[in-house]
Amino acid sequence: MSESGLKEQITGKVEKTKGQVKEGIGEVTEDRKLKNEGKWDKTKGTIKEKVGKVKQKISDGLDNKE
């Protein structure tokens, strides 16, 4: 199992959650900038999470060949 892949997945989930919180606060306070920052953080988190999953699958595949 790839440690870097797992680490990237966790980092992505944290960033995505942070984005959801920011977006929610921005929505409630009608702060467009904060809301947009939250959306961007969610997007970055989703990407990191998916990259981590791919890294893990590749690593698992390489481990199975050994």
Swiss-Prot record:
Region (Disordered): 1-22
Name of one Pfam family that matches: CsbD
Record's protein name: UPF0337 protein BA_0987/GBAA_0987/BAS0923
Family, similarity comment: Belongs to the UPF0337 (CsbD) family.
Composition bias, Basic and acidic residues: 13-22
PANTHER family tied to this protein: UPF0337 PROTEIN YJBJ (PTHR34977:SF1)
